[in-house]
A protein has these predicted regions:
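N-terminal first-folded block
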Residues: 1-25
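Amphipathic, hydrophobic secondary-structure cores in small proteins
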Residues: 18-20, 25-61
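Short, surface-exposed, charge-dense and proline/glycine-enriched linear segments
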Residues: 17-19, 25-27, 71-79
Length: 79
C-alpha cells in the first residue's frame, strides 16, 4: 500500500492533521492507544472506519522508518 493511499493530509480534514485515508481518524491516535496499552483489536473496535490492513501497514511503515539505515533523514525531518 502506497503511503499516500494510507495517510491523508488535507487542510479541510481536522485542520490538516494526518488521518487514515477515507476517515477522520488521526494517525497519531493509533500510537496513542498502543502507548496506553490498548490492543490493536481494541483500537479497531473503537475506530471501525480504520481497517486492520491500514493499521498494520502504518505500523510496518513506521518500523521500517525507525530501523532504516536512513534514519538520519528522519532526524532531519523532525528537527
Amino acid at each position: 500500500m502506497d503511503i499516500r493511499a494510507l495517510i491523508t493530509v488535507d487542510p479541510d480534514i481536522l485542520g490538516g492533521t494526518p488521518v487514515f485515508t477515507g476517515t477522520r481518524v488521526p494517525v497519531e491516535s493509533l500510537f496513542d492507544h498502543l502507548e496506553a496499552g490498548v490492543s490493536l483489536d481494541e483500537f479497531l473496535d473503537d475506530f471501525p472506519s480504520v481497517s486492520k490492513e491500514q493499521a498494520i501497514t502504518l505500523l510496518n511503515t513506521a518500523s521500517k522508518l525507525l530501523t532504516s539505515k536512513n534514519i538520519e533523514q528522519l532526524y532531519a525531518a523532525v528537527a
